Curated annotation (Swiss-Prot):
InterPro entries referenced in this protein's UniProt entry, alphabetically: Inosine/uridine_hydrolase_dom (IPR001910), IUNH (IPR023186), Nucleosid_hydro_RihC_nonspecif (IPR022976), Ribo_hydro-like (IPR036452)
Gene: rihC
Gene Ontology terms describing biological process: purine nucleobase metabolic process; purine nucleoside catabolic process; pyrimidine nucleobase metabolic process
EC supergroup of this enzyme: hydrolase
Coiled-coil boundaries: none
Entries under PANTHER family matching the protein: INOSINE-URIDINE PREFERRING NUCLEOSIDE HYDROLASE (PTHR12304), NON-SPECIFIC RIBONUCLEOSIDE HYDROLASE RIHC (PTHR12304:SF15)
Protein name: Non-specific ribonucleoside hydrolase RihC
Known EC number: 3.2.-.-
Annotated organism of origin: Salmonella paratyphi B (strain ATCC BAA-1250 / SPB7)
Length: 306
């Protein structure tokens, strides 16, 4: 199968990010042209190291650029309590000498977009700081972005504060800018990602699959978004799944605003499902997931990996 969708992946590895990177690399429908890292689950130095370790593990020559170390206006609040201090606890990766590109992520994204023969798809599975910096410094790049598919937000409850999802809450100002940008946005938030559970039976079969399965199984043992006994949530994989299998998702066009001021609500995505605010829709919001179909696709894409 010839890859037909050219993508750039912005990520903050992160254990579920590792699974998403595997899918982006090995799904035959996708052509991953650049990875950029951002501070989120852990510091940007750690997310960059983790992404480089994964690329070395897979012997991949995909270019990687390090991105923003802090949110636009706020100090970083990370999720080491979910992913471990390193961001990818549980597997001993082999040492390597690979380094990131000698330019920041938003410039690397600009360069790839502006040299592409046609608009490309951005996939963001961490805080949206790098995407906001791109749009702030190079607004003309928006014409070269086919769409932005992101893991973030929620139409209901949060997972970082009572109402805010982690990726949006880490940098609400960046997210607010992105949702106001006019880009075509597909939002895979907690409404679907909390459904994207890999069952204990599925997890137990991973080590026999291949090297990638063994590595991910080791990481999942240290992942705190679920457990090996009850199943683990694959938040970030949903964004990759939508690219390849959009029919697994139920989407609704909605106006989405990001709260930046509230003492208790900063980072909340206000998803106007019923159109009460009278604003034009600015995102396609995923609200339901075919869980069985998702698991089947995950098994298929992991089997493509070495």
């Amino acid at each position: 199968m010839t890859a037909s969708l050219h993508i750039i992946l912005d990520t903050d590895p992160g254990i579920d990010d590792a699974a998403a990177i595997a899918a982006a690399l090995f799904a035959p429908q996708l052509d991953l042209q650049l990875i950029t890292t951002v501070a989120g689950n852990v510091s940007v130095e750690k997310t960059t190291r983790n992404a480089l370790q994964l690329l070395h593990f897979w012997n991949s020559d995909i270019p990687l650029a390090q991105g923003a170390a802090t949110p636009l206006l706020r100090p970083l609040r990370d999720a080491a309590y979910v992913h471990g201090e390193s961001g990818m606890e549980g597997y001993d990766f082999v040492d390597h000498q690979r380094q990131p590109l000698a330019k920041p992520a938003f410039i690397a994204i600009r360069d790839v977009l502006m040299n592409a023969p046609e608009p490309m798809t951005l996939v963001a599975i961490g805080p949206l700081t790098n995407i906001a910096l791109l749009l702030m410094h190079y607004p003309e790049c928006a014409c070269n972005i086919h769409r932005l598919v992101l893991m973030g937000g929620s139409a209901g409850r949060g997972n970082f504060t009572p109402n805010a999802e982690f990726n949006i809450a880490v940098d609400p100002e960046a997210a607010a800018l992105v949702f106001r940008s006019g880009l075509e946005i597909v939002m895979c938030g907690l409404d679907v990602t909390n459904q994207a559970m890999l069952s204990p039976d599925f997890l137990n079969k991973l080590p026999a699959l291949n090297r990638t399965g063994k590595m991910l199984h080791s990481l999942f043992n240290h992942y705190r978004s679920g457990s090996m006994r009850t199943g683990v949530r694959m938040h970030d994989l949903c964004a990759i799944a939508w690219l390849v299998r959009p029919e697994l998702f139920t989407l609704q066009s909605c106006f989405v605003a990001v709260e930046t001021q509230g003492q208790y609500t900063a980072g909340t995505t206000v998803v106007d499902i019923e159109g009460r605010l009278g604003q034009p829709a600015n995102a396609q919001v995923a609200l339901a997931l075919d869980v069985d179909g998702f698991r089947q696709w995950v098994a298929e894409v992991f089997a493509y990996a070495p």
